[in-house]
Amino acid sequence: MKRLNKLVLGIIFLFLVISITAGCGIGKEAEVKKSFEKTLSMYPIKNLEDLYDKEGYRDDQFDKNDKGTWIINSEMVIQPNNEDMVAKGMVLYMNRNTKTTNGYYYVDVTKDEDEGKPHDNEKRYPVKMVDNKIIPTKEIKDKNIKKEIENFKFFVQYGNFKDLSKYKDGDISYNPEVPSYSAKYQVTNDDYNVKQLRKRYDIPTNKAPKLLLKGTGNLKGSSVGYKDIEFTFVEKKGENIYFSDSLHLEPSEDK
């Protein structure tokens, strides 16, 4: 009888441990989603100039009269099997104080040279935004680059995360010492955001991607750190295909 009681108590204890662990995991997943929710709920913002009037997270890193500067970055990286890795993207700095925007379009080609040591060759093309149109500030002779800049759209302009709750059973990671956190979800090719990416980019794989929400800083909010979105289609040695996006508010350099 004593042995049976010990066995029952052991099973109950194990059940409690599993329940508590699962509960903590679910709770942390909800926290990670909530930390992204304020920013992602703004997607899509078709007219980028609307960001001049949108508030972001502010703390004591901001001067009281500083409205902050929105920093937007969208990038597509494609490396076919054992070929060069090509990253193309754009960064914009949208100053809410002056309502001016500048940034650059970039093309970064990484080659494996000199005994396997990677060498990158990044070219930047400065741009500005006028009347919601992105315009090069210097002459560009390469017609393909000019067209890529003219047609460029940031993920924030067409992505949609109105219902984060549809992403479930994610692989959650949290390190309170950094602090850093992430949530990874397997999505399908029928996902709205995946369809939008395939519509705009020539993605050389039919594999469905994983969605990664990752960030650093206080989970409850901080102007220090970052929050990134990443759709990873392929990730292995010699072959990488992924899209990354970020939108965050930072203190302005000119107050």
Curated annotation (Swiss-Prot):
Organism domain of life: Bacteria
Example of a GO cellular component annotation carried by this entry: plasma membrane
InterPro entries in the cross-refs: Csa, Csa_sf
A Pfam family recorded for this sequence: DUF576
Keywords: Cell membrane, Lipoprotein, Membrane, Palmitate, Signal
Lipidation sites (N-palmitoyl cysteine): 24
Lipidation positions, renumbered (S-diacylglycerol cysteine): 24
Main location: membrane
Localization of this protein: Cell membrane
Membrane topology qualifier: Lipid-anchor
Signal peptide: 1-23
Family membership: Belongs to the staphylococcal tandem lipoprotein family.
Name recorded for this polypeptide: Uncharacterized lipoprotein SA0092
Species, as recorded: Staphylococcus aureus (strain N315)
